[in-house]
Structure formats: structure tokens, C-alpha cells
């Protein structure tokens, strides 16, 4: 069988791809050599901006299946309305702070994003492998991420800036406790759970709203590396999780997760013992047990990493009728920030890229958005580009209006007002650990905090853990050579 003809980007056949066109055997290259210029010019532009967070990742295709007829009681989204109904999905797993060439085994939260291609549009669940987050107000997010990256002078990771910020952000104690536990270094993307972390709103066909949190429970089970195992894997195979996911599916394996919700009655949000929209806290499973609403299965690898994984764009603002945002401040900030960074990284028409395209919408996407870089979907054809119009263009339908709810209070920059402090849940987490797990947790924290060269930063950071659990604080003091009385004094006067 003969090989296909090699062409330029414009489709012209190429006679020789290994030698440039020159003036004589030893002469200079001719500018008319379009084959060479076409090749070099495209190569010069192969890299697009790296994601500012979640740069290193892996992805796979699959499906979401509904196992129960109960789901429509709580949510009118059509992809949830029938037992056995399957919705195509694309997932992307990632580390958070590292660059694109960083190790899959680094101690870091893991991104857990799922794009549901539904008949009513794409629904993006953009979560992590942890049920909470470091901060609860998006105003802090750029500062937080800066501290997880590189020092602006040395261009090296800096424990001083890392712990300086976290020590002065006590709400981070819960997430930091998870990060430095065994779950901070998952063995693979298959061996971890996923969470929406944020509270979302479900609305049923009768207009009744509920608050929910989404949980993705790995059917493979959780498996983690110790710090020593993770460091060794980083040296031996920094792409271990990416490789594991691809090879598992290539061999016929189908990684799967049980998808569940915690369901809170709408009115309960006002009565719960802490603000249920605070993403630094979990809802007790005793108060709100898991209810299964689906099963997620991955069964197909990408054909091309760049086209499908690197160009994949997930946004919490991509919702469908029946699923709406909550007042969670971090979620509210992400509703803007995520599509905004996609427009920067991929262009204003990023949702025309096949992996992002809402292809399951019957009749296709219809709106009055036009032009911009890389408009490749017909650009609305000869139809009108304004609304209202008299030429049969698409029109809004009032029945798709979101659920109405009351808001009150003063417009001001203000923190959450809730009675629960930021140390109860991390303290509970520590006390639930086995003695071996506690020892590894303390060792992981001591190992990282040992890089801090400013004592006050160490003392402040340790004081947060001391407030969560005195035994934990004392063990950290011992490991770091800090006088526990200094920590006690700091904790007593700290009013952060």
C-alpha cells in the first residue's frame, strides 16, 4: 500500500521534506521555499500558554450512566431523567501547582474535572480529589497560587512564602491537613476519589430547590504513596499517573467511579451549624449521607493529547437546566475566572474546539455570537447577528429561567459570618487517623516546614495545627525544634 502524499498546510504536495531550496548547492536558502517557511513558522507557534494552574494532566473519554429512577425527584436535568441513560463524558485529571513537565507524584491536590456532553448543553464538574479547598474567598486566589509557584527572585520553590501565606490563612488548615496526609500523594488517578467541593443547587421540574455536593468514589479504591515512595517514583517515572491511566484503558480496563450526592433541603442552609457554602468545610455524612445518582466509566483514550487533553477547557459556569450555582464565594469567583482564562489560552471561540463543543445539543448551538479568532463553525451563516429580529433567529424561552431566591444585607466587602471556627474539622481529621498515619502526617509536615528559614513563620504555621489538636502541635514543635510555649503564646494572641 502506497503512503499518502505529504502536503503543506495549504494542501500543496511536497516533493522533498529533508532538503531546503537553495541558490546552488552551497548557496543561501531562497525565501520562495514555502515548504520550509510553512514548516518552521508553524513549529515556532506550536506552544500555547500553559495553564496557570493544573498544567500537568491526563484525560480519557467515557460515559455517565444513571442507575436510579429517584434522581428526577431532585433535579430536572435531562441527562439524569431515565434509568440506564448514558451521557458521553470527557475527564481530565491533573496536579495543581506544578508546571507541565512536573512529576505526577508530587505532593499536591489533584484536579478532577468531568465534561458531560448533554442534550441541553455541556455540564462541567470542575473539582478536586479533596472535599475542601485552601481558601473561601476568590480575592485570595491569585496570592495563594503565587505562593505555590516559584519565588519571583530566585525562581525556586520557596517554603517561606508557602508557609507565610498559609500560616496567615487559618481557613487553609483543613485542606493543608489533607494535603500532607497520605492522600496528598495518590498512587494514580484511578486510585483517588473526586469531589465537587463546592455546593451546587439542584432544581426539580416543580421548581423545588436543593443544595448538593457531588462525590465520585473510586471503584478501584484509594491507594497512596508514602513520601519516600512518591519521591522515588518522581525520579523513576515522573509521568507515572498519566502512563497508568492510558495503559490501563489501552489494555481494556475501564476505571470507574460511583457518583453520589449529599442532599440538603434548601431551608436547612440557614439552620446548619456552619455556613454550608464555606468550601473549607465538609458536610457531615451523618447529617447528609451519600445518595448514588450515577456511575462514571472511562473506556477510551484520546487519539491526540494536544487536541483533546491540552485543549480541553472546563468551567464551573457551564451548567444545564436543573443545576445552578450556590452562593459559595469561591465558586462565584471561578464562574468568571475559568472561562476567562480559556479565552486567553485558547481564544474566544474555544468552545468550537471539538473536545469542548456541545455536540449533543439537538440542532446545535444557536446564538448571536460572531467572528473572533478561529470561528470555524459556520459563524452563523447568513442568519441575523442580532436579537430581536424578524428573520427567524433563535429566541429565549422563559421556561428555562433559573430558580429565584431571596437575598438581603448590605453590599460590602465582608467575610462569611458563621459560628464555627476553622480548626474543628482538621482536628477531627487528625484524631481519626491511625497512629501510623499520624506519624507520617507529622513527618510530612516537619519535612516541608524544615525548609522555612524564618522562625516566626514556622511558629505561626504550627500554631494553627496546635489550635486544631494540641498533640499535633506538640509533635510538630518537637520535630522542628520549636519551644511549644512559643506556639501556645502565639496561638493565644492570634486573632486571624
Curated annotation (Swiss-Prot):
Keywords on this record? Heme, Hydrogen peroxide, Iron, Metal-binding, Oxidoreductase, Peroxidase, Peroxisome
SUPFAM superfamilies per UniProt: Heme-dependent catalase-like (SSF56634)
Q: What top-level branch of life does the organism fall under?
A: Eukaryota
Q: Name one GO biological process term.
A: response to oxidative stress
Its main localization is other
Entries under SMART domains matching the protein: Catalase (SM01060)
Q: Does the keyword Protein biosynthesis apply?
A: no
Q: Which cofactor does it need?
A: heme
Annotated Gene Ontology cellular component terms = cytoplasm; mitochondrion; peroxisomal matrix; peroxisome; phagocytic vesicle
The positions flagged as active site in the entry are 54, 128
Q: Which Pfam families match?
A: Catalase, Catalase-rel
Disrupted gene: phenotype observed: Cells are resistant to methanol, acriflavine and thiabendazole.
Q: Where is this motif: Microbody targeting signal?
A: 494-496
Concerning InterPro entries, the annotation shows: Catalase (IPR018028), Catalase_3 (IPR040333), Catalase_AS (IPR024708), Catalase_clade1/3 (IPR024711), Catalase_core (IPR011614), Catalase_haem_BS (IPR002226), Catalase_immune_responsive (IPR010582), Catalase_sf (IPR020835)
Localization of this protein? Peroxisome matrix
Task: Give EC number(s), comma-separated.
Answer: 1.11.1.6
Recall the GO molecular function terms of this protein's record.
catalase activity; heme binding; metal ion binding
Give the protein family. Belongs to the catalase family.
What job does this protein perform? Answer: Catalyzes the degradation of hydrogen peroxide (H(2)O(2)) generated by peroxisomal oxidases to water and oxygen, thereby protecting cells from the toxic effects of hydrogen peroxide.
Name of the protein in question: Catalase-A
Q: Which organism is it from?
A: Dictyostelium discoideum (Social amoeba)
The gene it comes from is catA
